């Protein structure tokens, strides 16, 4: 370890606790959290010997203690070992890799030192924002590059200093092949939502991309599901990866799942009833096609509710604006296609509605994971037609989960934040 690296690591147990007093901490989240994020061994962020500036960013982001995937992953990632990690959606996977990636970057070296690849533009923007917030006390330059934006802007930014790149595969490969994104110092590669990145959609791109990286590199894969393609990728590009599997149950413990049998023509009426009866903070409503997304959004507006819609055929700047405004809470309901099933973290979403039931278990798992984020509670409601009945049972069996008939009244304690508050006195005795 070099002298510069040694100076970066400041053990937090050095007796000087005064630095914490000056932190600008957000309000403490007193909502109930499930074992998906609380079932840990009691490790603290300080125990990883992270630099103080990074610790300040972690605490000021409101992250108090590592979740199970962070606890299992951060220490190993800091050693430089390859990682293959399976954990549920919404349990802190992004922090599990962002923290060690940022810690290992040397700001004095004005070159790309780490790259995070994600499958969608929205996830790239979200991940880059997290990295910026975590590293706000460090002189770190984070760049996000995705398709659908001006290539010339990316080229100009790469002419300056960039330490960490968050990218979708096609765009960053294009920049590498043009000789603009120079990767000789990029010794860390993270694939987030790795199952999607290793699917047919991106076939061949990752192999070409990895050829631009140094031979001595660290590769980390994070996902909720790992298809067979992961095995061949692992054998080809990874060296004795450390395997983490926190997937004994596939669905989030905090998401209660219901179904309602309806005829196709009754779906909008049923949705209207749900809007009236449920205490929705924010909801995401999934359809199986972009055309149905637009039609449903129009219907929802006609029956008197505000809603946004988003799908993959919209212009990128329009998608960005809708996504940003929904995150800010400017609208209660968002109708979308499966574009938004992966990694998107909007903590205010407490209800997910499958207006159209998904065709496979993997899509179902990712959709319902948009509620119940980071151990909080939420509900997923599935509108099931006669044709969907066999798919419903098959998905239940594949995910080893139970989807119950929806009761006349859904208990607010299952999904309403105000009903989930943990009393401060209870917390001290817990």
Swiss-Prot record:
This is ATP-dependent RNA helicase cgh-1. The gene is cgh-1. Signal peptide: none annotated. Pfam families: DEAD (PF00270), Helicase_C (PF00271). It catalyses: ATP + H2O = ADP + phosphate + H(+). Belongs to the DEAD box helicase family. DDX6/DHH1 subfamily. It is found in: Cytoplasm. GO terms for cellular component: cytoplasmic stress granule; intracellular organelle; P granule; P-body; ribonucleoprotein complex; ribonucleoprotein granule. PROSITE patterns: DEAD_ATP_HELICASE (PS00039), HELICASE_ATP_BIND_1 (PS51192), HELICASE_CTER (PS51194), Q_MOTIF (PS51195). Interacts with car-1 in a germline ribonucleoprotein complex. Interacts with ifet-1. Interacts with oma-1, which is a component of a ribonucleoprotein complex, in an RNA-dependent manner. ATP binds at residues 87-94. Its EC number is 3.6.4.13. GO terms for biological process: apoptotic process; determination of adult lifespan; gamete generation; mRNA metabolic process; negative regulation of apoptotic process; negative regulation of translation; oogenesis; P-body assembly. PANTHER family: DEAD-BOX ATP-DEPENDENT RNA HELICASE 50 (PTHR47960). Residues 74-244 form the Helicase ATP-binding domain. Keywords: Apoptosis, ATP-binding, Cytoplasm, Developmental protein, Differentiation, Helicase, Hydrolase, Nucleotide-binding, Oogenesis, RNA-binding, Spermatogenesis. Expression is restricted to two germline precursors Z2 and Z3 in L1 stage hermaphrodites, and is detectable specifically in the gonad at low levels into the L3 stage. Expression is significantly higher during the early L4 stage. In adults, expression remains gonad-specific and was not apparent in the somatically derived uterus. Expressed in germ granules (P granules); when associated with pgl-1. The keyword ATP-binding applies. The keyword Membrane does not apply. It comes from Caenorhabditis elegans. Residues 254-414 form the Helicase C-terminal domain. A motif (DEAD box) lies at residues 192-195. A motif (Q motif) lies at residues 43-71. One of its GO terms (molecular function) is ATP hydrolysis activity. Probable RNA helicase required for oocyte and sperm function. Also required to prevent the physiological germline apoptosis mechanism killing essentially all developing oocytes.
